[in-house]
From Swiss-Prot:
Keywords: ATP-binding, Cytoplasm, Ligase, Nucleotide-binding, Purine biosynthesis. The keyword Cytoplasm applies. It comes from the Archaea. Belongs to the AIR synthase family. It comes from Methanococcus maripaludis (strain C7 / ATCC BAA-1331). Its EC number is 6.3.3.1. HAMAP family: AIRS (MF_00741). Pathway: Purine metabolism; IMP biosynthesis via de novo pathway; 5-amino-1-(5-phospho-D-ribosyl)imidazole from N(2)-formyl-N(1)-(5-phospho-D-ribosyl)glycinamide: step 2/2. It is found in: Cytoplasm. One of its GO terms (cellular component) is cytosol. It catalyses: 2-formamido-N(1)-(5-O-phospho-beta-D-ribosyl)acetamidine + ATP = 5-amino-1-(5-phospho-beta-D-ribosyl)imidazole + ADP + phosphate + H(+). Gene3D superfamilies: PurM-like C-terminal domain, PurM-like, N-terminal domain. GO terms for biological process: 'de novo' IMP biosynthetic process; adenine biosynthetic process. This is Phosphoribosylformylglycinamidine cyclo-ligase.
Length: 349
């Protein structure tokens, strides 16, 4: 069975590397401009009067490799923006501005124009301004193009959604993803291009080509989630990216997140699993599996969350609940994420 690690990505090693880096960051300002207590969350924030200024930074990873193979660059900028703004809204902040960074080996005017179109589409959907950026020509350092960005968002101090209010009895509403989004591309590429000897133009069993599936842009959840925050007492918000539902542990770590009512898995994930003989647990540790964002609320508020999401043409479902503990193989587990799928109980560590 092929794994994400076989494809060159070790998420546990990445966790250790991040901890090693963070352990050396000890300096903090001592004046009134102080960081919010959000370590380990989706975004960082600093105090600014009655507000927090929120910053997120991210890129598109190896999705750009597929863009180069297909010579199609107009969707990956949407992915870059989505990865940033979807993280910012996880603490209830409204994204307002973006700066981008593009590193290139060489680039044509046509590719630049495609990237520009994608940037415009992404900022329009997110309702943010692109206020600057940097393009670096680095022919001796990289091959192709890499694209990243940083988003500024704002939230009133008394309106921040930290996830600390998540408690047993709450329910988890999952918002549909558009597909693979921007995580797990290394494993997907290994399955399609190495194991199955397909190319970007190859048709998959459900009719779409490999390029169409892998280059479908990440769903931007800004508008529906900001509306939800205004209308409902939201307890926690989670962008489901690398590591899958493990991301829920960024919220309240003292509870169990039980995912036991998942909707139909999207075709792209079935293709990857079948062609690569990928285990269920590996799939759920690597991909979003059709749920790109989670909203945690009181049970009575779930219907309103689903209504708002549907109004924005995003399907939504109650996919689970918060519990004090869960039972797995006769053992009581606490402070964890449990996914029940295909008659299996899988702990997402």
């Amino acid at each position: 069975m092929v794994t994400y690690k076989d494809a060159g990505v070790d998420i546990y090693k990445e966790d250790k590397v991040i901890r090693a880096l963070a352990s050396q960051i000890k300096f903090e300002r001592t004046d009134a401009i102080k960081p919010a207590d959000l370590k380990g969350h989706y975004a960082g924030a600093i105090e600014f009067g009655d507000y927090y200024l929120v910053l997120c930074t991210d890129g598109v990873g190896s999705k750009m490799v597929v863009a180069e193979m297909a010579n199609k660059f107009d969707t990956v900028p949407i992915d870059m923006i989505a990865m940033n703004v979807n993280d910012a809204i996880c603490i209830g902040a409204e994204p307002v501005a973006l700066v981008d960074y593009m590193a290139v080996e060489d680039i044509t005017e046509d590719i630049a124009s495609q990237i520009g179109k994608g940037l415009n589409d992404g900022i329009k959907e997110s309702n943010i301004n692109l206020i600057g950026g940097e393009t670096a020509s680095l022919p001796n350092m990289i091959k192709g193009v890499d694209l990243a960005g940083t988003v500024l968002a704002v939230v009133k101090k008394d309106e921040i959604v930290s996830g600390k209010e998540v408690k047993p009895g709450n329910v988890i509403v999952g918002l549909r993803s558009s597909g693979i989004h921007s995580n797990g591309l290394s494993l997907a590429r290994k399955v399609f291009f190495e194991i199955s000897n397909l190319d970007v133009k190859s048709k998959l069993s459900h009719g779409k080509t490999v390029a169409e599936e892998l280059l479908t842009p990440t769903k931007i959840y800004v508008k529906p989630v900001l509306e939800m925050i205004k209308q409902v007492n939201v307890k926690g918000l989670a962008h489901i990216t690398g590591g899958g539902f493990r991301k829920l542990k960024r919220l309240n770590k003292d509870v169990c997140y039980k995912i036991d009512e998942l909707p139909e898995i999207l075709p792209i994930f079935k293709e990857i699993q079948n062609l690569g003989n990928v285990a269920d647990q590996e799939m759920f540790k690597t991909f979003n599996m059709g749920i790109g964002f989670c909203v945690i609320v009181e049970k009575d508020d779930a219907e309103k969350i689903i209504e708002i999401s549907n109004h924005h043409n995003i399907a939504a479902f109650v996919i689970g609940k918060i519990e004090e503990s869960v039972e797995v193989n006769g053992e009581t587990k606490r402070e964890t994420v449990l996914v029940e799928y295909n008659n299996k109980k899988m702990i997402m560590e």
